[in-house]
Regions:
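PLP-dependent class I/II
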Residues: 1-152
Length: 152
């Protein structure tokens, strides 16, 4: 339902655990508004099949972007299903030496395409870049071509 960034969820458990969770949530993300919660309930109850309709769209976007990147020499894993793809830094020793943050900045400056450095997601993300698949497919293919052309 494209609500991932809103961090909506529910918890069932013993009252002491739920009370502790409330304390943490109140400090960490201030909970969610009632309007957003009601909207999520409507999405879950009225459009239960809608996410399935997105699978084909994101699969096509993923496949076309990966085709362009792989055609340009990138070695990218194929995610099962996600709104993004993960790109390892190119094998070139000079690029790998730059690291994901500097290389993402380089790509942005040369191509105008913003890739998220994987190190922002923790130690396991170092050496990787994340490319979101949230634009129309033709725009994503163009973005992938521009990323390929930005590699020295």
């Amino acid at each position: 339902w494209c609500l991932g960034g809103f961090r909506l969820a529910f918890a069932i458990g013993a009252e002491p655990l739920i009370a502790a969770l409330r304390q943490v949530k109140g400090v960490v993300d201030f909970n969610q508004s009632l309007a957003l919660q009601q909207g999520a309930i409507q999405a879950l109850t009225r459009w239960a099949d809608w996410p399935r309709s997105l699978h084909g769209m994101y699969r096509e976007r993923r496949d076309r972007v990966l085709s362009v990147l792989r055609g340009g020499g990138w070695s990218c894993p194929t995610p099962g299903m996600a709104m993004y793809v993960w790109l390892p830094l190119p094998a070139d020793a000079g690029v790998r030496k730059l690291g994901d943050e500097t290389f993402a900045s380089h790509v942005l400056q040369r191509s105008g395409i913003a890739l998220t450095p994987g190190s922002g997601f923790g130690e396991g993300g170092k050496g990787w870049l994340r490319m979101a698949l949230v634009r129309p497919t033709d725009e994503l293919e163009d973005a992938a071509r521009r990323v390929v052309s930005a590699v020295p």
